[in-house]
């Protein structure tokens, strides 16, 4: 589903991604973790070309993201992306946020888009908030609407860029529960997160990044209990004992 080959990304003289090669198979849940500034968010944002790469190739759903002539809108339509900051349209209701793209990009008729959106809002536990505007929703509710909106395009792949980082701690669980449900349903997902308990419970594989490189790839049990790379070992020690 996702193939990343020899990808490099620069910000001026700063080498943000260094020769990254990785793949995510259909139905696989891959969690990307690491310290701040390690390149996690940059990597996931290159997958749907929110960030452009300097070299290498990225292929999603059989489409080369960086090939000349790639229709970027059509390419992105096959990838759901959930941001840190929700990015809902403030002047649209929860329902309207979930119907806009299917109607404009997929040509869905309004009644069909409405029916689909209501089903998705129900799936994330927010059918009762269909007519609410984002300003009337909590952060956790806004992020669940954002997930429903991403699902409205029926993407085979979902990307999450630290989806709980902007939430109050008590709101985190409701968003992670929705994501866990997607994993159970077989959605292909690539997730950047600091929620290590979630990664342990849901991921098929964990990628650990630091300084623009993937330093370790492992099953969750191996990564959390038997990390091989010294930097991963230090990272896990630090998050387990933050005041020592």
Question: Which residues make up each language-model segment?
Answer:
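ABC family nucleotide-binding domain
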Residues: 1-220
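C-terminal boundary and immediately downstream tail of ABC-type ATPase nucleotide-binding domains
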Residues: 217, 221-244
């Amino acid at each position: 589903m996702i193939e990343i080959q020899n990808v490099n990304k620069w910000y001026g003289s700063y080498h943000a991604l260094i020769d990254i090669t990785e793949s995510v198979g259909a139905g696989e849940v891959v969690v990307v973790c690491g310290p701040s500034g390690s390149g996690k968010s940059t990597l996931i944002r290159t997958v749907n070309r929110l960030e452009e790469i300097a070299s290498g190739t990225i292929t999603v759903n059989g489409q080369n993201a960086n090939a000349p002539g790639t229709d970027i809108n059509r390419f992105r339509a096959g990838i759901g992306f959930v941001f840190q900051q929700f990015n809902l349209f403030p002047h649209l209701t929860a329902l309207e946020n979930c119907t806009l793209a299917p109607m404009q990009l997929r040509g869905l008729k309004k009644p069909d888009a409405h029916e689909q959106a209501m089903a998705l809002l129900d799936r994330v536990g927010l059918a009762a908030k269909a007519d609410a505007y984002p300003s009337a929703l909590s952060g956790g509710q806004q992020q669940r609407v954002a997930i429903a909106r991403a699902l409205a395009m029926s993407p085979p792949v979902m990307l999450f860029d630290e989806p709980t980082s902007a939430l109050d701690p008590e709101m985190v669980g409701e968003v992670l529960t929705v994501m866990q449900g997607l994993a159970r349903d077989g959605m292909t997902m690539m997730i950047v997160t600091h929620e290590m308990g979630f990664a342990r419970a849901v991921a098929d594989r964990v990628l650990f990044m630091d300084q623009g490189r993937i330093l370790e790839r492992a099953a969750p049990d191996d990564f959390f209990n038997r990390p091989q790379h010294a930097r991963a070992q230090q990272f896990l020690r630090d998050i387990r004992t933050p005041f020592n």
